[in-house]
Amino acid sequence: MKTNELADILNEFAPVSLQEKWDNAGLLIDNENSYITGVLLCLDVTEKVVDEAIQKKCNFILAHHPLIFKGLTKITQHTYTERCVRKAIQHNIAIYAAHTNMDVVMNG
């Protein structure tokens, strides 16, 4: 299965259109529709989570809380968000968040 296919399935179950206005659910980092080698589930994307995905050869992280809530103005090494984004891109890891859209669907 490819990244976009799993993202479509997740969006069918918990449509991004149902998220709160302040939220940022959906495919936050795309890995160019690569074939999925493994999926790592987490509550929050942290540097340890990205490192675990690399170690376990998972190239898709499914998180409840979005890593990116507001627009990034730069990607440096100064914040954990910037470091996670940079490392995920370097290792071809997609990150998908299902937050308030998942909270409001039945069985979500």
Where are these regions (language model features)?
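Hydrophobic structural segments
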Residues: 1-108
